[in-house]
A protein has these predicted regions:
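Helical hairpin unit composed of two closely spaced alpha helices linked by a short loop
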Residues: 243, 252-275, 279-284
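Glycine- and other small-residue-rich loops at beta-strand/loop junctions that grip anionic moieties
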Residues: 55, 85, 252-253, 287
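N-terminal localization/anchoring segments of enzymes in phospholipid and broader phosphate metabolism
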Residues: 1-234, 238, 242, 266, ...
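Residues at alpha-helix boundaries and short interhelical turns
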Residues: 91, 251-254, 307
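C-terminal structural cap/anchor segments
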Residues: 271-273, 280, 284-319
Length: 319
């Protein structure tokens, strides 16, 4: 419905301010296996720079594959810049990142756990939960997939009885974006680097001229711990409020506040087909059971709830 789309676009523009950009090619990467394959291929093709921002970078098989490949590209003259979160990578030994630095890669720890190492006001809960890979300022990967072997399995997993998080495949989704909107994602990376007082970046073509690669319209929306409210959340609430036919959400850590709860129930009440795909188990028992405490109200309000079996759902998507 064009009227609904126009209304949503106008609301987003008023709330966010970032442009809606035409000329992009968006490719759905439906699981960790396809995401890593696409990322590795793009990294190998990099000619100028690689910017990686990830909440978690683990010292496991996948993490070491990334490290080896990034170091190889750095040796070939491609500047690699990496941001990782101090809490997300708390179990990753310092030697892992020291090896990257020794190879010439610029590495920035977001909001170090040690307050004495912080270069700005220190707040323990200020975390960088982004997962962004940027190649030559023209290709971007965004979504829920961290750098960790738990995402390595494909999307078709066998049903298993165990729910141990270290033995169950994690189900997640990424997008590959080629085209002009990548410059907006690059700005988000640069903004984080600057606000965290990272070392001076090597002079590279971080914002090259970008040509249209497809016909997809894309708006990049970023939120940070410094923001007074989440722009992403406001966009989601407004989209649900404008929905007339269907709302489909997947969420790994679904603990709706009163506003989101009301938005979903109100949508179902006006005849919208509201469907939630949520985890059947989680790496956070507290969050899992807190989310389930809202099931009765949602179901009573006409919202349909499904639980993902056979894998640990980590996706956060909305249609």
């Amino acid at each position: 419905d064009i009227d609904i789309l126009d209304k949503q676009i106008a609301l987003e523009q008023a709330i966010i301010g970032s442009p809606l950009i035409l000329g992009n090619k968006v490719t759905l990467l439906q699981d960790g296996a396809s995401t890593y394959a696409a990322m590795f291929a793009a990294i190998r093709k990099a000619r100028d720079h690689i910017n990686l921002e990830s909440y978690i970078i683990e010292d496991d098989e996948i993490g070491r594959q990334f490290a080896d490949l990034l170091l190889e590209r750095q040796r070939q003259g491609v500047q690699v810049n990496v941001i990782y979160d101090s809490v997300g990578a708390v179990n990753t030994p310092a030697a892992f990142f020291d090896r990257l630095r020794a190879g010439g890669i610029a590495v920035l720890e977001f909001n170090p756990l040690n307050p004495l190492a912080a270069k700005k006001e220190w707040l323990i809960y200020n975390r960088d939960h982004r997962k962004i890979l940027l190649i030559d300022g023209s290709t971007a990967f965004i979504g829920g997939i961290n750098i960790s072997s738990v995402y390595s399995s494909g999307s078709a997993t066998k049903r298993i009885k165990t729910t141990a998080v270290n033995t169950v495949a994690w189900r997640d989704t990424d997008l590959q974006i080629d085209g002009p909107v990548v410059a907006e994602l690059q700005k988000l990376f640069m903004e984080t680097w600057q606000k965290q007082h990272g070392p001076a970046l090597a002079p590279k073509a971080y914002f090259p001229p970008l040509k249209a690669q497809g016909k997809d319209l894309v708006r990049a929306i970023g939120s940070t711990p410094d923001d007074p409210f989440s722009l992403i959340y406001l966009t989601l609430i407004s989209a649900i409020g404008n929905a007339e036919r269907q709302v489909e959400l997947t969420n790994a850590y679904f603990v709706p506040d009163p506003q989101l709860l009301k938005s979903l129930i109100d949508a179902a009440g006006r005849g919208v087909d509201v469907r939630l795909i949520l985890p059947s188990h989680s790496d956070s028992d507290v969050v899992f059971h807190a989310g389930r405490s809202h099931y009765a109200a949602l179901l009573k309000g006409g919202v349909k709830i499904y639980e993902r079996q056979g894998a640990l759902l980590h996706s956060k998507t909305a249609v």
